[in-house]
Structure formats: structure tokens, C-alpha cells
Amino acid sequence: TWTEAIDAMPSNLQMMFVHAYQSYLFNEMLSMRIERGLPINMPVEGDVVIPLDPNGNPQHENPVMTTAKNIDLVARQIRAGRAFVTGALFGSDSILAEGEMGEIERKVIEDNGLKAEDFVIPGLPRCSSKGGRRELMCPVKSIGSEFREDGYTLRFSLPKGNYATCLMREFMKSEMRDY
């Protein structure tokens, strides 16, 4: 059966399938947000924002819903680098945004024919995912560069869950397949 085939794989590879699909959905939501002209670096009403701790680590356990009453304060926190606007990593217990971003998140989920319970897999419980939120932008830390005769070296660090290939594409302005 398909469950036996997946169960035969290492557990980290099993979860990679789930995380890849969640990332695909996240990227669809992010693309729609950009297409609608919504900022990714500033909040709009209904956005879920994640504050950072004093060490700069996202506090996913303390999401803040952006409302008309708190939008100015939330925007100040984001401008100061103490919080980030997020998008859904869809799962069984996902907190979805409200307002226009909530509409986008729900549309992507609906267009893909998904329900929250689809991320609970009784036959493979370790592949179940509760979901969460991911920052729409990530800070690039410790960036440095060096020109040499034989090429160019770019050094940087990214928070966990972010991909250097995506950042490199922005620097190189070429498709990842061309690297």
C-alpha cells in the first residue's frame, strides 16, 4: 500500500513531503498577496504578525492579529525589526489571517481542495502536521562579500526554515536551474 511505501522511508524524508506541500501552498499565498499589491514588509488589517524575542528569534507561540486599533503599533514594531508579517503553513490546527490576507489563504486552500483534517494522517501519524505561520520576509544577517581573481564569494546567514537558493536567485537574477 502507499502507506507502507512511505513508512519504509526515513522519517525525515517522510516529513519532507508534507513540508514541501505546505511550502508550495505558502508560496501560492505569497504570490497572490504580491499580485494584489499588498505589502510583504508592512501589515494590513487582518495580518497575523509574529514578534521577535530579544535575540531576534520568532515567537511563533505569540501571534498578534493586526486590527484597526493596533495597526500603527504593529507597523512600528515591524519597522524596528521586532516583528514580521506572516503567511499560513497550512495544517490541521492552522491559524488563518483575517481581512484580505485571510481571503487569500482561504482561496488557496479551497483551490487545492483541502480541509484542515487532510493534514491528520491516521495511517502515518508522524506525517500529520498541525501547521503554523512563516514570516513573509526574512532578515539576512552577517552579510559580507569578497572579490577574488577566480570569482566572487558572498557570505550570509539566514534564520532556520529559509533557503539560500532563494536569496541567491535575487542576487544573481537568474533561475535556480542555471546555478
Language-model features and meaning:
Residues 1-179:
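Non-catalytic, substrate/partner-engaging modules appended to enzymatic cores
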